[in-house]
Amino acid sequence: MHKDVRHRFNAAFTPEKYEAFLHTVNTAYGEPVTFRVCETPVFVPRDLKNKLLKGVEDICAVITRPDFRKKSAAAIPPHIQVPNEAEHTVFLQLDFGICRDAEGNLTPQLIEMQGFPSLYFFQHLLAEAYRKHFDIPADFHHLFGG
């Protein structure tokens, strides 16, 4: 996605670096990963990052409206509703797929919204391992807040 950084990353990639990276991920906390880990991080260009952030802001504006719970109550069948649910979730995860629009530009499309922190720790570990074993530019962050 970010062509210059992608080219530099690919040019410097070696199977040995990837194996060392996997070793870090699998041994850092005593529990090996049970799924395939991608050889490379995703390098998101600034314009796509801004589109992602705008999408998050738009979704949050809807789900934090005072009337949202009332309007969405029928979306969850009574037999799977959670008793004593908090007014707002502590965690919010928005998963986006990256597609091309009619003009060929990269654009995010919401895939899923979750209210639990299932992968936060692993994603931080993964980002740190990429930095340890590969030359990731210092101004690229895995957290949008920097």
Report residues per predicted region.
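Preference for protein termini
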Residues: 1-146
